[in-house]
């Protein structure tokens, strides 16, 4: 059960080809702009999370996220503790 950290929209595209049903995805930094890509993909919304502070810093609101869960840093740490490996995707 992997945790995929998405730091850019390009990273999101690469991750979509390697995602498995028991994996989880976290959008961070500019990766939050990829929320729409995931909303239109085969990945269920309950498998995707977004760092709330990064979404807020980019002017995104919870209602715009299409069911993607907004989490804080404490919850981020919890995800890293529950999933292995943790894979980072950027460009």
Language model segments and positions:
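Short, glycine-rich nucleotide/cofactor-binding loops
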Residues: 2-13, 25, 29-31
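Short, well-ordered alpha-helix to beta-strand connector turns
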Residues: 22-23, 45-46, 83-84
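N-terminal beta-loop-helix "entrance" segment that forms/cooperates
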Residues: 32-44, 56-63
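Short internal beta-strands
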Residues: 25-31, 46-54
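Active-site-adjacent betaalpha module
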Residues: 9, 22, 34, 78, ...
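C-terminal structural segments of small proteins and small subunits
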Residues: 62-91
């Amino acid at each position: 059960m992997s945790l995929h950290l998405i730091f850019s929209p390009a990273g999101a595209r690469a991750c979509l080809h390697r995602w498995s049903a028991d994996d989880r995805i976290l959008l961070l930094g500019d990766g939050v702009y990829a929320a729409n890509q995931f909303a239109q993909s085969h990945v269920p919304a309950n498998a995707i999370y977004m760092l709330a502070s990064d979404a807020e810093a980019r002017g995104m609101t919870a209602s715009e996220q299409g069911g993607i869960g907004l989490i804080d840093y404490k919850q981020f740490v919890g995800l890293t503790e529950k999933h292995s490996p943790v894979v980072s995707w950027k460009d």
